[in-house]
Amino acid sequence: MPDLLKKYWLKFTNKRKYLALKNKLNKDKELKHFKEHLEKDLNEIQFKIKNKKELNFLHSGTSGDLVNSLPVIKELSKTHKCRLYVGVDKPLEKFRPNNYSPYLLPTHTYKMLMPLLKSQNYLSEVERFNGQSIDINFDIFRNFPVSLQFDNLRYYFHVAGIQADVLSPYINVNEHEKIKNKIVIHRTFRYRNHLINYKFLQKFNDLVFIGVMKEYEDLKKDINNLQFHDCKDHLEMAMIIKSSRFFIGNSSVGHSIAEGLKVPRILEASPDFPAAYPHGDDAYDFYFQNHFEKQCAYLENKYKKN
């Protein structure tokens, strides 16, 4: 009996065998697709890294995803000249209520991100993708036949076959001239932890929110003394984070930047998609309220200037 007919027969006669066969057929389908498509792409990437002195990268993901790819590019820049081309206005496969746009990286966000990317000296060129020749396409991580609920910094390790250093800073910016020694918060509507709240932060001073106004207004309901700064671009955002006492945020471009700068930081971990992880010193994450409050108290006592 052909596998497809057998599957439907077992669906009504033997649930256990049906599920086992269904799983096998799905795995066989994944393997076939991997062998026919993705494996070839990964092998070509290894060949180009070995044989070329200049590498062109493509990334069409979110701003946070782009920042998360920088450790691999920085590592390869030690032996190659690296150019990054950014895909803009690529549609989301699924639109979710907490997305701000139907695109992974809309044009206005691309323009916000460019000054930060262009300021990194290991990127010899950063431009919008317009059909340039590409050696390493970071977008293929979305086609991996594996769950993406693992460390999102490591997605790009498995595209390039490079184990990059994520304990040392891989973003370099100057400190902000005016906004210094603040507790900097960046909390988006996506990847929130419904088990916790920020109300206890009202007893802290020097709180500043960076992000969009509606996110600030939402958090202001819980933190009366929360201030707002409208960053002109992600470079200014990075400078404010670099100058902070410590950073608090959920999985977002703000946390990705804080992770790249290696400032003291606390991640609001997402119970629904736990794919962001802190690495290095003074890097914390939490799922529960008591732990959140304890981490904030520790960093406040350690870094507050009297």
Q: Residues of each region from the PLM?
A:
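Catalytic machinery of carbohydrate-active enzymes
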Residues: 2-306
